[in-house]
C-alpha cells in the first residue's frame, strides 16, 4: 500500500500535544501509572508507526506491558500486505472480547493499513463491538485526540 505524505499545520500539531498534556494530567492523578500494550503486524513502516504511537502514549503518561490483561489501552497496528495478517488480527480481536469483559474500561484500538480498508473496518465495527477505535495511518497524527475523546466521553 502506497504511503502519502501529508503536511500537518503547526497549530494542529500543537493541538495534539495539548491533548497529550491533558491526558498526562489525568493519568498523573491515578494511584498507579496506566499501562499500554502495542502489538505490530507487518512491515517496517508499521514498526515506525508503532514507535510513534508509543511516543504519544509515553507523552500521555502511559507505561508499557506485554500483557493485554494489564493494559488500559491496547493498540493493534495492522498490515494489509503481509500474508495471513488479517486472519491473525481478527483472531486476536476475538480473543480480546474476554479481556474486555473483565476490564470494561479498557480501550481497544485497531489501526494501520488494514484498518484503513473499508471492508475490513466495517467487519471490525460489526463483528467486534468491543473495539473502541478503528483508524488508518493517514490520521495517525490525531491519535492523542482520539484517545482524549474516548477518555472524556466515559
Please place each PLM-identified region on the residue numbering.
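Cofactor-cradling patches in redox/metallo enzymes
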Residues: 1-146
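The C-terminal output helix
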Residues: 148-154
